Structures are given as structure tokens and as C-alpha cells.
Regions:
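C-terminal helical/coil "lid" or tail adjacent to the Rossmann-like core of SAM-dependent
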Residues: 119, 123-182
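Short glycine-dipeptide loop
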Residues: 63-69
Length: 194
């Protein structure tokens, strides 16, 4: 997350009158702050990590007594569209492969509950949602994710720049078609109180 997004979050919190919220940019690979927070929230991070258990343990350690750890992570195998679309299929294959080559697990969401248990985090609660769109900003999520990861797809030699460009065009035409449907990934939320 960059400083621009953090400034937007700070502004939104100030507009809402929230004075007890802090937004900071930290490297999760070496972040350690035991018993420092009433709530620790982590969204869409663990599937990028080769050692998600390490961060889960450190996040749990950062929660004060009476506080909560809330983690959301996707299971990208759950994405779908209708009717079938080559650009969408390219996005799923390419994005998943980049995550894998960089040491992550694009389906970590379904493993999150087991991760809590293995990390010794007691009594986790589990919820899952899967957004679906026929129009609007949410429907552009697959396209915008493919666009944002285009350089990584080429750098990892998953596909050529020309293949990415062609798939972006195919996926965009599909996205703006009001007769089509695109889902997001299944999103697993697991939480526990200390």
C-alpha cells in the first residue's frame, strides 16, 4: 500500500471523526509489535507470502488482551464468469502462476482457518463471501488486476506483452458487456478474540 492510499484512508477516518485510528506503511516480513493493538486487520496479504504462518503468529502476538485479529484472504480458484471468456481465463492462469512463482498460494483463503489453528490462535470464526457483478466498478476487478500485474506476468515469462495486451482488450470488451457476469474470488474471513 502506498502513501497516497494511506493518505486517503487517513482523510476518510478524519471525516468520520475517528481519532483513534492509525494508518502506517510497514514491511510485514519484519513487523513485530507485541500486545500493541486492540484490533489487527489483514486483507489480501497472506496469499502473496511464502511463509504466511509467520505473519499470522506475529499478528496474533500484536493483539492486546480483549482485542481481535481479523484476516481476509481470497481463494482465486473460485473466480468465474459467464459466458466463458478467453481474456478472463488468461487472467486466472497468469495471475495464479505469478503468485506461485513468487512463492505465494493463490488459493490460501480456504487454508486460512487451518492456519489459525496451526498458529495456536483459539476459537477462530469463519465467514466467506463471493461478490458477483453484472455492471459497475466491481466488475472491472479482473481487468484492473490483470492490468496491474501485466509487468509481473511478462517479467516472470508467464506470457508475452502482446498476449497480455490482447487479453486485456478481450477481457475489457467482456467486462463492459451488460449481458455478461463476472465474480470476484471467494473471500474467506477468519477472526479470533484474545
Amino acid at each position: 500500500m502506498d502513501e497516497v492510499k494511506l493518505d486517503l484512508a487517513r482523510h476518510a477516518a478524519a471525516q468520520a471523526g475517528l481519532a483513534n485510528v492509525e494508518f502506517r506503511q510497514l514491511d510485514v516480513r519484519d513487523w513485530v509489535e507485541p500486545a500493541s493493538y486492540d484490533a489487527v486487520f489483514c486483507r489480501f496479504v497472506l496469499h502473496h507470502l511464502s511463509e504466511p504462518m509467520d505473519l499470522l503468529r506475529r499478528m496474533w502476538a500484536a493483539v492486546r488482551p480483549g482485542g481481535a485479529l481479523i484476516v481476509e484472504d481470497p481463494d482465486f480458484d473460485g473466480w468465474c464468469c459467464h459466458p466463458p471468456n478467453e481474456g478472463f481465463d488468461f487472467f486466472l492462469r497468469s495471475y495464479g502462476e505469478v503468485i506461485k512463482r513468487r512463492g505465494g498460494d493463490h488459493a490460501y483463503g480456504r487454508k486460512l482457518y487451518a492456519g489459525f489453528l496451526a498458529a495456536g490462535i483459539p476459537a477462530p470464526e469463519v465467514h466467506a463471501v463471493q461478490p458477483v457483478w453484472t455492471a459497475g466498478e466491481g466488475k472491472t476487478l479482473a481487468w484492473s488486476t490483470l492490468e496491474a500485474t501485466a509487468d509481473a506476468i511478462v517479467a516472470e515469462r508467464v506470457a508475452t506483452a502482446q498476449e497480455v495486451t490482447a487479453s486485456l482488450e478481450t477481457l475489457w470488451q467482456f467486462t463492459v458487456d451488460t449481458q455478461t457476469l463476472i465474480s470476484g474470488p471467494r473471500i474467506f474471513q477468519v477472526s479470533s478474540r484474545r
